Design a protein with these regions (language model features):
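Alpha-helical transmembrane bundles and membrane-interface segments of multipass inner-membrane proteins
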Residues: 1-154
Length: 154
């Protein structure tokens, strides 16, 4: 359980710090890091990950709260190291974007998420979005390998 929460806290902290940096450094100045392949561009996103479904900010906020509550409830039961990392990445990513939705304008549960990483032909995203996607990939891999999240002790 400690691994799950350490992973979540680390992702949340990295996401928080990088968003603060993006707000400070990228306001009117997008930066080309690797030509047009990788750019840092500040975007205020009212939708879900990768700017999907804008206009449903409150619904996504409530869903994120449900994910956080469920994760905290089930966390003590997860014994697999791989699943702890996957769920920790998910929790950290969800908390990162939920922090924006709670504390950023236009207001409580409807705040815009700060996105800043841009690749060609792909929506602008952030560290939290990346963590959620990596969590999904790990969970998919663990599921395909039939790795249970909970090892039953007999």
């Amino acid at each position: 359980m400690r691994r799950l929460f350490a992973t979540a806290w680390t992702i949340w902290l990295i996401d928080f710090v990088t968003k603060a940096w993006a707000l400070q450094s990228l306001n009117a100045n997008p930066r080309k890091i690797i030509g047009t392949f990788l750019q840092f561009t500040l975007v205020h996103n009212s939708g879900a990950a990768f700017s999907f479904a804008t206009g449903f900010t409150i619904a996504f906020s409530l869903l994120a709260l449900a994910v956080v509550i469920a994760t905290i409830y089930f966390a003590p039961k997860i014994t697999s190291m791989g699943w702890q990392v996957a769920i920790g990445l998910l929790l950290g990513g969800v908390l990162g974007n939920l922090t924006d939705r709670i504390f950023r304008t236009p207001g409580f549960l409807s705040g815009h998420v700060i996105d800043w990483i841009q690749l060609p032909n792909w929506p602008v995203f952030n560290i939290a979005d990346s963590a959620i996607c990596i969590a999904a990939a790990i969970a998919f891999t663990l599921s395909m390998r039939n790795v249970p999240p909970i090892t039953r002790v007999r």
